[in-house]
Amino acid sequence: MKFIAAVLLVALLCPKDSTSLASRLSGLLGGDGILGGSGLLGGLGKIPLGGRLLGGRPDDVLREDDVLGEVGGRPDDVLGEVGGRPDDVLGEVGGRPDDGLGELGGGPNRLFGGSRLFGGVEKVVAGIPLPNVADVAGGLPVALPVSVRRRRALGVVGGLPVPKLPGVAGGLPVPKLPVPLPVNL
């Protein structure tokens, strides 16, 4: 209990910038990732504390770009961020911005043959090329249910479209949803 109280006190007192101790506590307490990360699926969710968000900025749950919470002290775009930079659509892996549907191992994915989304040759999962695979949830390739433009409005959780949410308010995390099987492998 003393440790939890100390963590909450530090989160309230630290500055709002993404390098603050409070922002790092979000990764420490909930994990830093797209599925199961702090403020995302199965993580801490948003914890309003006197106008502050544990490990991030104030709980501005009505922001247009705020769908499933914050990670690392910055507002998320759709499904949060990994590596300290804002995500493009479904977050990033390896500390670089994603190329439309996220990255694996720090390199941009190539999907369907071109320069961005629908612009590449293949998606690489754990070193294995998987053509015509949309995104990866929990290490598993999942089908792309809607277009990326619609996903910016809807958001995608575990490969399933979900209504746009005003963040994860009141400290309630978003439950995990079933992950569909990959297609066109």
UniProtKB/Swiss-Prot annotation:
Function: Has a hypotensive activity.
GO molecular function terms noted in the UniProt entry: toxin activity
Tissue expression: Expressed by the mandibular venom gland.
Signal peptide range in chain numbering: 1-20
Protein name, per record: Celestoxin
Main localization of the protein described in the UniProt heading: secreted
Keyword vocabulary terms for this entry: Hypotensive agent, Secreted, Signal, Toxin
Top-level taxonomic group: Eukaryota
Record's subcellular location: Secreted
Residue ranges of the propeptide: 21-148
GO biological process terms held by the UniProt record: regulation of blood pressure
GO (cellular component) term, any one: extracellular region
